[in-house]
Structures are given as C-alpha cells and as structure tokens.
C-alpha cells in the first residue's frame, strides 16, 4: 500500500529541482498524521514554484495517487484560491518549507461549507442527466472524488460549531450528533471508502447516486440555517 514516504520523496525531489531561490510547501489536505491508503491523501500543494520544475517530480505521485489534486502556485495565486481550498490547507501538515499561511477564518469556513455542499449536490444531480451510465472504474473514482467536497464541508462545519476539525468521519459524526444535526451525522458516518464506492457505483450506479443525493440534501437542509447566523 502506498504511504507517506512517497510524498516525502516527492518533496525532496521537488525542492532540489526548485533550488535555493524558491520556497516549497507541500501539504496533506486531509491533515492526517500518517496517511496510508491512497484515498487518505487528498491534496498536495507546492507554493512559490515554477510549474515546469516540478512536473516530472509530481508525475510519479500522480500515477500512484490518481485521486490527488495537485496545486503548483506562486504566492499570489495561492491567495486567490477559493475559500474551500484555502480552508483545507489551513489545517494541513507541512512537509517542507516555512511559508506562512493565512489562519483559518470563520468567513472562509462558511464559504467552504456552502461550496462543499453545493458542489456535491450539483455533481450528483448531473449524473441523472447521463443518457448512458459510464460503468467504468475511472468514472466511479471521479464521482467518489467529487463527493469528497461533502466530507470536507462536514469537517469544516465541526470547526465552525465547536472549534475542532476532526481527522476522521467517526469523530465528525459524534460532534454533529451532539449538536442535534442528525441527518448530517448519519450521512458522514456512512462515508464510503474508495473501493466500496467504486464497486457500488459500477454495479448499481443509479441507486448509489439517488441514495447519496437524498442524504446530502437532508444534511444540507439542517446545516444551511446555521450558516446564515455565523
């Protein structure tokens, strides 16, 4: 199983290619201490970089972690990222470099939560428009990846409500249950891993999409009124 050592190697190679005149900051968007399964590594960020310097270094990681989103940016481009991504990186673990990131802000949290829920629902509802279901592994992985926006919105919500951003969905479900958000807690507690979701999507795609559209819609109905008061 791929592990975090690969990302350490990536950071070393990229830093060497960038040279001493560039700062490198690579982060785990999941904020996991030691992500082992591929689906625990969600984002890799390189800041103050020239893109062609790190293309070769990141290619190997892309091959092993096909669902990772890569960001190769300069500082100004980082500041212009949507709140959803800035908020994830505010909690991520630094691998290399000492570039200061903006602190987590409540306004960013609200924007991130709204974007996470709306993006997820839009993606799920777009699947209903398909004339033919693309029953393929790549399609299933992409749908599952898009659903991760809901997962992150849920973690962001925990921070907004309790000042704690949990590293696992089990803890998130407990926090939401304690806040009386039953639908949101039930939805995130059933968060599927990649292998399970891909199998279900390839065997019963319509049933899977309908089920998650219903769950995320119910969760958003609970959550949305809270955001207007924050």
Enumerate the predicted regions with their spans.
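Catalytic core of pol beta-like nucleotidyltransferases
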Residues: 1-16, 20, 32-38, 48-230
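Short, glycine- and small/hydrophobic-rich beta-strand elements in well-ordered beta-sheets
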Residues: 21-28
């Amino acid at each position: 199983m791929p592990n975090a050592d690969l990302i350490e190697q990536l950071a070393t190679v990229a830093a060497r290619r960038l040279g001493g005149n560039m700062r490198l900051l690579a982060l785990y968007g999941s904020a996991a201490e030691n992500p082992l399964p591929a689906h625990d590594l969600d984002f890799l960020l390189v800041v103050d970089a020239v893109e062609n310097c790190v293309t070769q270094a990141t290619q190997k990681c892309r091959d092993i972690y096909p669902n990772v989103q890569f960001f190769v940016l300069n500082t100004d481009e980082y500041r212009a990222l949507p709140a959803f991504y800035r908020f994830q990186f505010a909690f991520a673990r630094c691998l290399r470099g000492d570039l200061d990131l903006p602190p987590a802000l409540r306004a960013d949290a609200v924007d991130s939560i709204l974007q996470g829920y709306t993006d997820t629902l839009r993606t799920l509802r777009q699947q209903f428009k398909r004339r033919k279901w693309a029953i393929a592994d790549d399609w299933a992985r992409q749908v599952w990846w898009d659903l991760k926006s809901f997962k992150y919105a849920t973690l962001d919500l925990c921070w907004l409500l309790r000042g704690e951003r949990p590293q696992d969905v089990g803890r998130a479900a407990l926090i939401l249950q304690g806040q009386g958000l039953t639908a949101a807690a039930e939805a995130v507690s059933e968060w599927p891993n990649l292998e399970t979701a891909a199998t279900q999507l390839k065997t019963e795609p319509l049933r899977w999409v309908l089920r998650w559209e219903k769950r995320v819609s119910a969760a958003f109905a609970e959550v949305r009124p809270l955001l207007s008061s924050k």
